Design a protein with these regions (language model features):
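Conserved cytosolic headpiece of P-type ATPases
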Residues: 1-726, 731-734, 747, 762, ...
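Membrane-interface starts of transmembrane alpha-helices
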Residues: 83, 774-781
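Generic alpha-helical transmembrane segments
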Residues: 704, 779-794
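Alpha-helical transmembrane segments of multi-pass integral membrane proteins
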Residues: 741-756
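Long hydrophobic segments that form regular secondary structure
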Residues: 758, 763-764, 774
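Short, charged/polar, low-complexity loop and linker segments
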Residues: 769-772
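A C-terminal functional module that forms or caps the active site or interfaces directly
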Residues: 797
Length: 877
């Protein structure tokens, strides 16, 4: 359709074959098949071949291909077989294939998470309000819009109740546009002036409305502008960036060492023949291969992917990978009360004032709907509709008697909303909201069918009733009315909400989630400060805060109005005093977050409403609500709680700590292994013998090391995961003594491996002598010992400081990886064809025993060092 803004709502509905109650499910399915999903076209994903070729550009693989080329030239000149060349190329091929597989898996995991947080919208189907994924919208669908909703597709407005839409994504104009239903004149009205239209990519910031969808997907204005939506590159976490920097630093360092070894070998050889140059180059390549932790990037990516998938199963959907690392550093969690801390299942348990009038006012000044199984909508509003129904006052019947004909929608600044209804005698306005705010606008009250002046004595009595309910941890709302002879011309809040007649109070209980008390206690044990933020009365907030264990005294609570009297400098000094904030508005949440952040605290903040987006963006970890959250808050959040539960945040923090710990374990294991290989090749070269060839080192790095490293990434959390303080976000990779551990463990494995090489060589010649050149037996023993040593060492890495024998559970995956790596190592040594290809000699039982005994030494030595480190740490305390 074109120029829908020139047509009336009825004309547009007729052209689309729709009606005000929406399409049927059958019609929607038919149109979806015709028009396709409501999605913008994405850039084509690279093919498997393109991904494979991209993997071959990896610097490590380029070095290996250069090594294969040099080896091919050397073997061709000497007339030897091309076995080594073949092995290197197979390793290159396998590594590239593994890279493609892991990249595809990681991408699939991210896509699965994106599906979980897919945008949804409220639509009328078969005359009933249902929630569907926005991608399922079709032309002719009737959607319901309210503050916080992202407009899911282009549409012609059918209703607008003071609705304002921010269309900056389309027009560049940040000022929200006030929408209306009337048709527009003129052939080419600019997009920003089409006040009876709404467009994909814009956001409802105030009011509510109803629209019929006129265009979806690439037919929308956004689709025409976008053409092709560029695919967003997956962001790297700070840890991944640090590892990339580490890789670059190591590459430069290794290049320097390689050049030194290359020149050193040539000088020692005393000749510069082609054969000498090529063989010396292969030694330098061996050193380069030894220094590069081939599996590190893969391990980190896989552990992060598995971690975020596990977190999603526990209702914490990570939208940005950076959040995984930041979670482990969290020091303050600022949480809304309703939803995260309570069950969000409101029930009216107390009320004051005339019951029938109160129930009528609460049900009509309300956007929830009554269905067969109860009310649906925002929990507080649904509770009020159910309360009215329990009095025999069903909302549809009330609406038929008193249809709505005007309104001032709720906003957090006024803390109230008002609706105007037609009656037999004229018009009546109902207002509901925070008791103190509503009461402030009242000049009279109703009692026994009479309207009486609101005296100070009565006002004090009403406030006392409000406090009595609040002290019981009830959420209290007030209702008021105002009569009109004619429909008011001006329906702005400041015009409507004055000279009101007070009706009564409704007190609702929202039960505390049973698991939250334990989660709050777990926070405190983990050195995390839980902070509750609510719009409730201070007395209600204090009662709930005490029950949850967030505060012990009312002095630890403060109101939003008190915050207004504090400067930022004063708030910075006072922020640590308060753990409960009552009567808070969205702008207060931004100030609270920023005050904690200025103190250097890593802060998480929850939010659900459209006005919460700034505070969520300001926080180190923005947490959106999956059930009650608006599209706006979900889109800016780093993490979305699919169950809106505070305990899930604590679970996510624990998982974030576990993931980071495990990545550090894998880093320590891989870098210690690479350190041993570098030192081994370097010192062996200085001593005049070849410890291991490039293919041997590749096998150890990609087979012996990679599987245990991945298994370490799946290690369960250690017993003190949630009883130690958060780590400092500024800490580097090697913080906490990790650098020292890598160094001494690398030296230890080097000594064990070189000792094994010398023993193997001496067993070959039958007497003791320092090896020179290449010793096949020595090389075989070095390979076997280093492989077993690193396999045993992976068992050490289950904990950086604790004895592995004190850990409460076993890592079955690690045991499987260790056994698998050992089996593959044995296969290489025992299958003649493979052993010959690698240049290995048969291994006797005696040699196996010697290698096993030497390799096993890594366990007791590391355990002893850990014991010394633990005692030193205790003395330091």
């Amino acid at each position: 359709m074109e120029k829908e803004y020139n047509r009336s709502p009825q004309e547009v509905l007729e052209e689309l074959g729709s009606c005000p109650t929406g399409l049927t499910e059958a019609e929607a399915a038919e149109r979806l098949a015709k028009h396709g999903p409501n999605k913008l076209k994405e850039a084509e994903k690279p093919s498997l071949l393109q991904r494979f070729l991209t993997q071959l550009k990896d610097p490590m693989l380029l070095i290996l291909m250069a090594a294969a080329a040099v080896s091919a030239v050397t073997n061709a000149l000497s007339g030897e077989s091309f076995t080594e060349v073949f092995i290197i190329l197979v390793v290159v091929l396998l590594n590239a294939v593994l890279g493609v597989v892991q990249e595809s898996k990681a991408e699939a995991a991210i896509e699965a998470l994106q599906t979980m947080t897919a945008a949804k919208c409220k639509v009328l189907r078969d005359g009933h309000q249902v929630i569907i994924e926005s991608s399922q919208l079709v032309p002719g669908d009737v959607v319901l819009l309210e503050a916080g909703d992202a407009v899911p597709a282009d549409g012609r407005l059918l209703e607008s109740a003071s609705m304002k839409i921010e269309e900056a994504a389309l027009t560049g104009e940040s000022v929200p546009v006030t929408k209306a239903v009337g048709l527009l004149t003129g052939d080419n009205v600019p997009l920003g002036d089409r006040k009876n239209m709404c467009y994909m990519g814009s956001t409802v910031v105030y009011g509510r409305g109803k629209a019929v969808i006129t265009a979806t997907g690439m037919d929308t204005e956004m689709g025409k502008i976008a053409g092709v939506l560029a695919q967003t590159e997956q962001e790297q976490t700070p840890l991944q960036r640090k590892l990339n920097e580490l890789g670059k630093t190591m590459s430069k360092l290794v290049l320097g060492i390689c050049v030194f070894i290359f020149i050193f070998d040539l000088v020692v050889a005393g000749e510069f023949t082609l054969d000498t140059v090529l063989s010396t180059f292969m030694v330098a390549v061996s050193l380069a291969v030894a220094a590069i932790p081939e599996g590190l990037a893969t391990v980190v990516t896989v552990v992060l992917s598995i971690g975020v998938t596990n977190m999603s199963k526990q209702h914490a959907v990570i939208r940005r990978l950076t959040a995984v690392e930041t979670l482990g550093c969290t020091q303050v969690i600022c949480s809304d009360k309703t939803g995260p801390l309570t069950q969000n299942k409101m029930t009216v348990v107390e009320h004051t004032g005339p019951t029938e009038l109160l129930a009528t006012a609460m049900a009509l000044c309300n956007d929830a709907a009554l269905e067969e199984n109860g009310a649906i909508g925002e929990p507080t509003e649904a509770a009020l509709v159910n309360f009215a129904a329990a009095q025999g006052l069903k909302k549809p019947v009330l609406e038929s008697r008193q249809p709505r004909c005007g309104e001032a929608p709720f906003d957090s600044g006024r803390k109230m909303m008002s609706t105007i209804h037609r009656t037999d005698n004229g018009f009546i306005q109902y207002t509901k909201g925070a008791p103190d705010e509503v009461l402030r606008r009242c000049t009279s009250y109703t009692e026994s069918g009479q309207i009486l002046p609101l005296t100070e004595e009565k006002r004090t009595a009403i406030l006392a009733e409000n406090k009595a309910m609040a002290d019981k941890a009830l959420r209290v709302l007030a209702a008021a009315e105002r009569l009109y002879d004619a429909l008011p011309d001006r329906q702005e809040p400041e015009d409507l909400e004055q000279d009101l007649c007070f009706i009564g109070l409704a007190g609702m209980i929202d039960p505390i989630r049973p698991e939250v008390k334990a989660a709050v206690a777990e926070c405190r044990a983990a050195g995390i400060r839980p902070v509750m933020i609510t719009g409730d009365h201070k007395d209600t907030a204090v009662a709930i805060g005490k029950e949850l264990g967030i505060i012990t005294d009312a002095s630890q609570a403060v109101t939003g109005s008190a915050l207004d009297s504090l400067t930022d400098e004063e708030l910075d000094k006072a922020v640590e005093k308060y753990s409960v904030y009552a009567r808070v508005q969205p702008e207060h949440k931004v100030r609270i977050v920023n005050a904690w952040r200025r103190k250097g605290a890593i802060t998480a903040m929850t939010g659900d409403g459209v006005n919460d987006a700034p505070s969520i963006k300001s926080a180190d970890i923005g947490v959106g609500m999956g059930i009650t959250g608006t599209d706006v808050t979900k889109n800016v959040a780093d993490m979305v709680l699919s169950d809106d539960n505070f305990a899930t945040i604590v679970t996510a923090v624990e998982e974030g700590r576990r993931i980071y710990d495990n990545i550090r374990k894998a880093i320590q294991f891989l870098l210690a292994s690479n350190m041993s290989e570098v030192l081994g090749v370097f010192f062996a070269t200085l001593l005049g013998f070849t410890l291991l060839n490039p293919v041997h080192l590749l096998f150890i790095n990609l087979i012996t090391d990679c599987f245990p490293a991945l298994a370490l990434g799946l290690e369960k959390g250690e017993p003190d995961t949630m009883t130690r303080p958060p780590r400092d976000s500024k800490d580097g990779i090697f913080a906490g003594g990790l650098g020292f551990d890598i160094l001494y463990q690398g030296v230890l494995i080097t000594i064990i491996t070189m000792t094994s090489y010398i023993i193997g060589h001496c067993m070959e010649v039958g007497y003791f002598e320092m090896p020179k050149g290449v010793s096949d037996d020595g090389m075989t023993m070095a390979f076997l010992t280093m492989s077993m040593c690193e396999i045993f060492h992976s068992f050490n890495m289950r904990s950086q400081r604790k004895s592995v024998f004190s850990l409460p559970s076993h890592n079955k995956v690690l045991w499987g990886a260790m056994i698998g790596s050992l089996a593959l190592t044995t296969l290489v040594l025992e299958v003649p064809v493979i052993a010959n290809a690698f240049g290995f000699t048969p291994v006797s039982w005696t040699e196996y025993g010697v290698a096993l005994a030497l390799a096993f030494l890594v366990l007791p030595v590391v355990e002893l060092v850990k014991l010394i480190q633990r005692r030193a740490a205790r003395r330091a305390k």
